[in-house]
Amino acid sequence: MPLRTDTSKGLALGAPATLYVGLLVVAPLGMLVAYSFWTQTYVAIDHSLTWENYRSAIGDPLVRHLLFRSVWIAALVTLMTVLLAYPIAYFIAFRTERKALWLLLITIPFWTSYLLRVFAWKLILGFNGLLNSGLQGLGLIHEPMTWLLYNEFAVVLTLAHAWAPFAILPIYVSLQKIDRRLLEAATDLGSGKLERFFRVTLPLTIPGIISSSLIIFIPTVGDYVTPALVGGADGKMIANLIQVQFGPANDWPLGATLSLLAMVTVGIVAVGYVLLLRFLGSRIR
Amino acid sequence: MTAETIIELSGVEKRFGTLTAVRDLDLELVKGEFFSLLGPSGCGKTTALRMIAGFQEPSSGTIRIDGEDVSTVPANRRPTNMVFQSYAIFPHLDVGDNVGFGLHRSGLSRKERRARVSEALELVELGGYERRRANQLSGGQQQRVALARALVMRPKVLLLDEPLSALDKNLREAMQLELRRLQQSIGITFVMVTHDQYEAMTMSDRIGVMFNGQLEQVDTPQTLYASPGTRSVANFIGGMNFLPARLHNEGGGTLDMEIAGFGAMAVGRNPNVADHGRNALVGIRPEQLEIAAHRPEGYDSTVQCRVADIAFYGESIHYFVEVDGVPETMTVAVPNYFHSVDFTRGATAWLGVQAASVIDLGRNRDNETQQGEKT
Ligand SMILES: Nc1ncnc2c1ncn2[C@@H]1O[C@H](COP(=O)(O)OP(=O)(O)O)[C@@H](O)[C@H]1O
Ligand SMILES: [Mg+2]
């Protein structure tokens, strides 16, 4: 069929993307929303629409607690990762000529699967783990430290390590993009190194910091592998509860509701964070 | 050092590995002057300027500003400010905050700072632009912001690295005059780097001409034009026809020469040339040559020529002519005065020149190196 107008041409060109987005984003999301308004009876789904899932989920202290803790842990992970990533990105952007080599080294953890990396931390932090046996062997401690594993600390540490490259790259890119003459101009106008960093470099890398933070924060809120493996009882997060609904508890409508609640929460926190950082950036003169 | 000196460079040298970007630079700048460093791209102008600003440390030599040795003073504590080639306007700040950037440590109150900023913006004719964002500005406006940002610091010396090179021609010419007026009204010493001879000529009190890291001549534009000290300077400032000559007698104020193609003439001695020899070189500016259909009257020398090519510039016409005995094609520039002269390609014509228009360029080194190569 010949294409006659620009409009039809445009539609034809856009069709694959539309199809892709429709099948992979809109359809699953639509199903999730639909499920959240249905009810699980013993074996079947009751398709009459109801707010009951939302009411019971929001009313459940465990849900609120897990949601809050997920956001809290994700915020800690994000903060720690970005704080660690910034100096590394700065070093690669400004202090070395071997940028490619360093960037390659940073991605090395990605050469193994994520699951293996989590298990590696288990081996390091565990009761008979590398750290405990090493320190015992050196005579620095007499009995294994048990606070290392199965808690929030282990989750934050494992995730911060896993996300490091994702945090470094956006910050590195934004540092690399800074016109070096801007730094010279600041020096020329009397700024010392520290002042120059806070008044020029940092505000110009806020977009990089925002991308880094969101790249880490958003998936971390929904992570369930790490808390399941190294989190123990008080390291559990909202995703673990969601997973239970879709698995053992077999309550898909409640699982869908919890997923949507988590998504909305992440959305609100993320938008608030972006606005806050933009505002802080605009206050720097 | 006289009381008037503001910058004094002595024996300043900058090496990057095996490359010597600036060699043995001696220079004294006077308070309140507009000085330009002129030279082709890559000759070391920017490096010299950056050493004055403190962005680059000299490999050897000393730099004094207003009597104080600043060789080891970091850039942020030097009494100089710079207008960067790309302007380097802070993209995250508005115009007012850009201009006020350096006033933070001045101890001025917020109100005083604001007054200084708006005063500086008035100076560059951007009054009321405080709250504009940098990306809303045209190239010319960014240039003015950069200028205001540096001037607001009230530096002893303002450094400008090719400040106009990014502007289009009309704006550039307007800005040349404006910068010059501004400099005269505020009386701060300006040091400008440029590769554009016209820019340097129209704006500067004095020009330093640099080649290959070496300062070849420092003089007023008029002197550089009338009495260039070397062939390179003569070639870089304005157009120049070079002619080999024989020096017969160098007694008194004039030199008796036999000039290729133009015959015997008594040429005025160039005070900026020290070295004379039997193999001599002279120069004639294209605009100092008369071209006519018949042998022109009243010239010290006239020769016949053939028009090889013509270039039309609007305000002037350039004829490229061949003269018997002159090795290179000569250029004749004629003002486009109601098309008073009009030759076609291949036509025969006459050239006339006054002895006073012939510039003595000293010993002909080209000739010597050629002969040296042959032996
Ligand atoms: N930081 C540097 N490292 C190595 N070489 C440099 C550096 N800066 C300038 N150069 C070299 O020094 C020479 C002079 O450069 P520059 O001062 O920028 O010239 P100009 O401003 O006259 O065009 C050039 O050959 C340039 O490549
Ligand atoms: Mg330069």
Positions of PLM-derived features:
Chain B
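ATP-binding/catalytic-site motifs of ATP-hydrolyzing domains
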Residues: 62, 68, 214
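Helix-to-loop junction immediately C-terminal to a conserved catalytic motif
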Residues: 53
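Conserved post-Walker A/P-loop segment of ABC ATPase nucleotide-binding domains
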Residues: 56-64
